[in-house]
Amino acid sequence: FLAFLIIYYGLQSGFSIGFANPSILGVAQTMAEIPIFSGTNVRVVCCLANITFLYIVTMLYYRRIRKDPTKSLNYGSDFHSAFEVSSDKVDSKMTKRQILTAAVFLLGVVLCVGLTIACKWNAKKIASYFFGMMIVIGLVSGFSMNEISDKFIKGCKPMIYASFITGLASAIAVILNQGKVLDTIVYVLSIPLNQVGAVVGAGLMVVVNVIVNIFIPSGSGQAAVMIPLMTPIADLVGITRQVAVQAFQFGDGLCNLLTPLNGPMMGCLAMVGISFPKYIKWAFKYLMMNIGAAIVITMVLQAVGWVGF
């Protein structure tokens, strides 16, 4: 589970409320008709605060299990990890062939980054590139084509369960969206925004976006649903559009660590052998602290009339 915190929390700490995310923040600001990436100064501070908070959470867990390994979420768990870890000792000294293999791998990664930027590759092309790179690395390592195939299949086995969990979580969100269930949920949640003042309404916007994000984990998808609805309400109540966008960003980003419909998170939890109920029981208090701080910050920004440009 510590590996999950280091990798997934590390990723989300910068991405969830990132100040230069074109696919989420850029889209939301464009739809709200405010300058793209305006308000960067405040968002940089918020992003750094989020990184610091999740780093502290990770370190608290690390120190707890270092002092007492039985307090690990994995201890005594009957929910098995997707990966089998061997306890056999191996020779840590790298051979010349292994060094060559590592060099080819690093060169391949650098080449992939360059080609992705130059040729504007999408995810499918990148996946195809790495599939071909796997064959090259296998040959450099001295394996036959049959051995490469066997090792590839063996490597895919632990990912099947995680992929199934990821697909299932995403499918639920698709069903809610295609079934028009989300339209009703969003409408009901938006009603109280018209009944309160600007400062309280700004904080309430964060809460509404948190709830909506449980059903729409996609940031761009939530922006398409919420921004056209929130913008006229913000104008009516007296909330600045910059604050409305920030409320959306807080609600969308911070809730990604909370919703079971977040396919990538559920897949990562499956890989480390932690069930969602066990995870949320541990993480809930920290996530509520983070969301609570976001509500207060949003209300303060509205109180000072933040427009960001």
Model-derived segments and their meaning:
Residues 155-159, 163, 192-196, 247, ...:
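Loop-to-transmembrane-helix entry motif
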Residues 40-151, 271, 306-309:
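Long, contiguous bundles of hydrophobic transmembrane helices that form the permeation core
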Residues 1-32, 215-249, 272:
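Hydrophobic transmembrane alpha-helices that form the pore/transport pathway of multi-pass ion
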Residues 141-160, 276-282:
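Hydrophobic, small-residue-rich membrane helices and short re-entrant helix-turn-helix hairpins
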Residues 18-45, 81, 235-243, 263-309:
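Transmembrane alpha-helical segments and their short flanking loops
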Residues 166-169, 176, 192-232, 236-237, ...:
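Hydrophobic alpha-helical transmembrane segments of multi-pass integral membrane proteins
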Residues 13-14, 46-54, 108-112, 209, ...:
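Alpha-helical transmembrane segments of multipass membrane proteins
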Residues 1-13, 39-43, 48, 198-213, ...:
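Alpha-helical transmembrane segments of multi-pass membrane proteins
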